[in-house]
Structures are given as C-alpha cells and as structure tokens.
A protein has these predicted regions:
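Proline-threonine-serine-rich low-complexity tracts
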Residues: 1-178
Length: 178
C-alpha cells in the first residue's frame, strides 16, 4: 500500500476557560478523513491554546495509515476570550482638602480584580469630589480586559469635610455714653 490517506478537516472555535486556556483533539478537527486500508494515527501540529492565541490560528492535522503513508491538511482554529473580568472593589473615605476638593484613582478602589487573560484598563464613573458630595456616594469601577470584555462593580465613597473653618475677626472700637 502506497496510497496516502485523504485528510479532511473542519475549522473550529475554541473559547478560553477561566484559567485562560483551551484545547482541541485531532478527532474534533478530523471531518471524515479516510484511507484505503486503516488510519493508524491522527496528530495535530498544535492542540493547546492560551490568551496569546486569541484570533485565528492555522494548524495541521497529520493522518498516518497502518502502512506508514502520511498526509496532512490545514484547519483554522479561532480562539476567543469571552470571559468578563472579575471586578472586586473596596469602599473608601475621602477627606476634602483646604480648597474643598478630593480625588481617588481606580487603583485605590480596585481590591484585586482579575481576568483570565490580562486587564487592559480600569476606569471610575467618578473620581473627583467637592463640598457638594459630602456624605456617601456610589461610584462604579469598570474593568476592561485586553480582548474587550467588560464588567463593573460599585463602591461607596464617603466624602468628608474635616477642615475647620477659619475665623477672621476685626478689632472694633466701642464708645460708651457717659
């Protein structure tokens, strides 16, 4: 037997899991490969994927028959990350300064947000406060990963005015009637 197997592949989509990895098997890629005798093995040029593979990847399915005849064909594996970041926030207290203003950063509000791939940005719905915000304020931390998945969570920001007023007095001369 000198006849090569006929290799037939199919394209697949792989969604990464919570750890940022995904995999496929040769039988998933094989779409009905045949041989005039018997197929002995099916192997893939790549079967494991991670965050660095997001997008399209060309792989090869290699089929070998029982007599050592080999052929291969390509398949396109589309790797996608559809898992939103896990957003974890913490409440903060902001003391206004002498000008009546105060601010916070997304990093201060973030309390350990994670993503199966990588976090690209953290933004706050409100980061600057003034005297009109004294008391409790609910804000949102929005986290976006490198693949465009977004989620957000709220945090309570307590704004306080702890600067004592400055009292300015003037001297007065009082005349008394005798």
């Amino acid at each position: 037997d000198v006849i090569k197997p006929t290799v037939i592949t199919q394209n697949l989509t792989v969604s990464l899991d919570a750890s940022g990895s995904g995999s496929i098997t040769a039988t998933q890629v094989d779409n009905g490969s045949t041989d005039n005798c018997t197929i002995a093995t099916r192997t893939l040029s790549k079967s494991s994927f991670d965050c660095s593979d997001v997008g399209t990847n060309t792989i090869w399915l290699r089929v070998t028959d029982v007599n050592g005849n080999v052929d291969s064909a390509s398949a396109v594996i589309t790797v996608q990350d559809v898992i939103k970041p896990t957003v974890v926030t913490q409440n903060l207290t902001v003391s206004l300064d002498a000008t009546g203003s105060g601010s916070i950063t997304a990093t201060q509000v973030d309390n350990g947000s994670t993503d199966n791939c990588t976090i690209a940005t953290r933004t706050l719905s409100k980061s600057s406060f003034d005297c009109s915000n004294v008391g409790t304020n609910t804000i949102w931390l929005r986290v976006t990963d490198v693949n465009g998945n977004v989620d957000s969570a709220s945090a309570v920001i307590t704004v306080q005015d702890v600067i004592k007023p400055t009292v300015v007095t003037q001297n007065l001369t009082v005349s008394l009637d005798a």
